[in-house]
């Protein structure tokens, strides 16, 4: 399996690995904007923004997003860690363009409505409650705080109830504009396809993404 890399004019890195033995297509977008890039007042915003991304776009509702993934027989995932926020979709190889278009729509055209923001904030509060009642999570959080103190690595990826309560649409929109740009994104895919095709589809669906500036760890 050969790995190839092309950098688009807007800074987006396009990486492919061809695998002729599989009938599946896996695509992911990795954004260089995990919790290490947050200020203390922003703590939790990277994870919050990740949650909001699948809630609807200018062309699709949340239900339509989920229905399209189901119709394709695919599955999607998203996660946030200290360094990155990532989004992925897996479908049959013949549905690869549909997956790329959907992922681009989700990342470029998400609409963060006040109702969805309030609803998703409560979802994250529930995640916090579950973590607070999980001994492994409590240990890991305590260890990070002890070792790193007030540095970004010492803060919880989920944020706190105080910081999340102060994060609204203006803050989420600003975070997305700052972080979800060509200089911060890597589009990576694996399956039975040619690298040149992936580059062409990346230019077609991600070409309007602004270059922006590379995010700096705090």
Residue ranges and their predicted role:
Residues 21, 26-90:
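M16/MPP (pitrilysin/insulinase) zinc-metallopeptidase core fold and M16-derived inactive scaffolds
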Residues 13, 32, 46, 134-135, ...:
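Hydrophobic alpha-helical segments, principally membrane-spanning helices and signal/leader peptides
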Residues 1-24:
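N- or domain-start disorder-to-order transition segments that initiate the globular core
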Residues 2, 7, 62-217:
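Charge-rich, well-structured scaffold segments of protease-associated domains
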Residues 17, 217-218:
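Short, solvent-exposed loop/turn elements at beta->coil junctions and helix N-caps
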């Amino acid at each position: 399996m050969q790995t190839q890399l092309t950098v688009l004019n807007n800074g987006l890195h396009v990486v492919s690995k061809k695998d002729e033995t599989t009938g599946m297509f896996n695509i992911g977008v990795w954004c260089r904007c995990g919790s290490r890039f947050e200020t203390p007042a922003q703590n939790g915003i990277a994870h919050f923004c990740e949650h909001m991304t699948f809630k609807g776009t200018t062309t699709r509702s949340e239900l339509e997003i989920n229905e399209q993934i189901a119709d394709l027989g695919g599955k999607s995932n998203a996660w946030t860690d200290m360094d990155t926020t990532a989004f992925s979709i897996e479908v049959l190889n013949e549905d690869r363009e549909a997956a790329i278009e959907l992922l681009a729509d989700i990342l470029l055209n998400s609409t963060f409505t006040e109702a969805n923001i309030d609803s998703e904030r409560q979802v994250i509060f529930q995640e916090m409650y579950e973590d607070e009642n999980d001994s492994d999570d409590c240990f890991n959080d305590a260890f990070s705080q002890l070792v790193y103190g007030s540095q970004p690595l010492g803060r919880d990826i989920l944020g706190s109830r105080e910081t999340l309560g102060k994060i609204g649409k203006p803050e989420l929109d600003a975070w997305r504009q700052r972080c979800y740009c060509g200089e911060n994104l890597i589009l990576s895919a694996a399956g039975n396809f040619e690298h040149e095709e992936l580059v062409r589809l990346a230019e077609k669906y991600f070409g309007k993404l602004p270059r922006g500036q590379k995010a700096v760890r705090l």
